[in-house]
Amino acid sequence: MSVERTLILVKPDGVSRGLVGEVVGRLERKGLTLVALELRTLERSVAETHYGEHASKPFFGELVDFITSGPLVALVAEGPRAVEASRGLIGATDPVKAAPGSLRGDYALEIGQNLVHGSDSPESAKREIDLFFPGLS
């Protein structure tokens, strides 16, 4: 089975609540391997590029403000079906609809502050990894 990579962001709410270890632990226990990890406060230009698909939506400004409001942890995990596996661990975008046992289902209440971002496809993962970790490929 081929190995793929995915980008995971522990958003500022997850970092401030001390949930980085929980996120990393769940990824590792699932069998994914960390290949890059960085604590950083995101530059607005990077956030706008990352969330560019939402630029015309009314929540875009709030989304960018939130993701740049404090430190986040950006990481790259790899393994077979890494995107699908990590999305399952993260849970639905709306934490109220996220399954119990998922990160969002267990630890989040608000769509706007839902702890974690995970790439939604291998193609998105490549684009996002190139943005956050240039030259990693």
UniProtKB/Swiss-Prot annotation:
The active site is at H117. Its EC number is 2.7.4.6. It catalyses: a 2'-deoxyribonucleoside 5'-diphosphate + ATP = a 2'-deoxyribonucleoside 5'-triphosphate + ADP; a ribonucleoside 5'-diphosphate + ATP = a ribonucleoside 5'-triphosphate + ADP. GO terms for biological process: CTP biosynthetic process; GTP biosynthetic process; UTP biosynthetic process. One of its GO terms (cellular component) is cytoplasm. Keywords: ATP-binding, Cytoplasm, Kinase, Magnesium, Metal-binding, Nucleotide metabolism, Nucleotide-binding, Phosphoprotein, Transferase. Its cofactor is Mg(2+). It is found in: Cytoplasm. InterPro entries: NDK-like_dom, NDK-like_dom_sf, Nucleoside_diP_kinase, Nucleoside_diP_kinase_AS. Belongs to the NDK family. Homotetramer. Major role in the synthesis of nucleoside triphosphates other than ATP. The ATP gamma phosphate is transferred to the NDP beta phosphate via a ping-pong mechanism, using a phosphorylated active-site intermediate. This is Nucleoside diphosphate kinase.
